[in-house]
Amino acid sequence: MPRSSFSGSLSSPKLDVVIDMGNPFLNLTVDGFLKIGAVAATRSVAEDTFHIIRKGSISSNDFEKSLKKMCKEGAYWGAIAGVYVGMEYGVERIRGTRDWKNAMFGGAVTGALVSAASNNKKDKIAVDAITGAAIATAAEFINYLT
């Protein structure tokens, strides 16, 4: 009986930039900042490009606004990633073990810090800390599955 099959593979390009700050904590924090900051900046550019194409024209004001938004988003999300990675690494060093609890604690502290920096009230800070912990823990569990 004749059979046909299809096979293929998909691999993503990988780019690693290493900046040696002389301290593993700083190395991981800067790495997280740069990687997530670049993703946020790229997302911002893609979103603004979509809106410009939809509008049908571009002005120097649109370009300047897009560039400012790209830098702002990259710095914001990069800083959040840097705090999270730094907290997770710090907890790992203190506890002496690497597991999902480090991610949970890092996510909780990062969520609380971001919320407090946004001048939210105590209840909202607590909810954001729980959300940060839940997201970080879920991401860690998903990484264990793959």
UniProtKB/Swiss-Prot annotation:
<keyword id="KW-0472">Membrane</keyword>
<keyword id="KW-1002">Plastid outer membrane</keyword>
<feature type="transmembrane region" description="Helical">
    <location>
        <begin position="103"/>
        <end position="119"/>
    </location>
</feature>
<protein>
    <recommendedName>
        <fullName>Outer envelope pore protein 16, chloroplastic</fullName>
    </recommendedName>
</protein>
<comment type="similarity">
    <text>Belongs to the Tim17/Tim22/Tim23 family. Plastid outer envelope porin OEP16 (TC 1.B.30) subfamily.</text>
</comment>
<dbReference type="GO" id="GO:0046930">
    <property type="term" value="C:pore complex"/>
</dbReference>
<dbReference type="GO" id="GO:0045037">
    <property type="term" value="P:protein import into chloroplast stroma"/>
</dbReference>
<dbReference type="GO" id="GO:0034426">
    <property type="term" value="C:etioplast membrane"/>
</dbReference>
<comment type="function">
    <text>Voltage-dependent high-conductance channel with a slight cation-selectivity; selective for amino acids but excludes triosephosphates or uncharged sugars. Non-essential amino acid-selective channel protein and translocation pore for NADPH:protochlorophyllide oxidoreductase A (PORA) and possibly PORB.</text>
</comment>
<keyword id="KW-0934">Plastid</keyword>
<comment type="subunit">
    <text>Homodimer and oligomers in membrane.</text>
</comment>
<keyword id="KW-0406">Ion transport</keyword>
<keyword id="KW-0812">Transmembrane</keyword>
<keyword id="KW-0813">Transport</keyword>
<keyword id="KW-0150">Chloroplast</keyword>
<feature type="transmembrane region" description="Helical">
    <location>
        <begin position="75"/>
        <end position="91"/>
    </location>
</feature>
<dbReference type="GO" id="GO:0006811">
    <property type="term" value="P:monoatomic ion transport"/>
</dbReference>
<keyword id="KW-0626">Porin</keyword>
<dbReference type="InterPro" id="IPR045238">
    <property type="entry name" value="Tim23-like"/>
</dbReference>
<keyword id="KW-1133">Transmembrane helix</keyword>
<feature type="transmembrane region" description="Helical">
    <location>
        <begin position="128"/>
        <end position="146"/>
    </location>
</feature>
<dbReference type="Pfam" id="PF02466">
    <property type="entry name" value="Tim17"/>
</dbReference>
<dbReference type="GO" id="GO:0009707">
    <property type="term" value="C:chloroplast outer membrane"/>
</dbReference>
<dbReference type="GO" id="GO:0015288">
    <property type="term" value="F:porin activity"/>
</dbReference>
<keyword id="KW-1134">Transmembrane beta strand</keyword>
<dbReference type="GO" id="GO:0042803">
    <property type="term" value="F:protein homodimerization activity"/>
</dbReference>
<dbReference type="GO" id="GO:0015171">
    <property type="term" value="F:amino acid transmembrane transporter activity"/>
</dbReference>
<feature type="region of interest" description="Contains 4 beta strands">
    <location>
        <begin position="1"/>
        <end position="73"/>
    </location>
</feature>
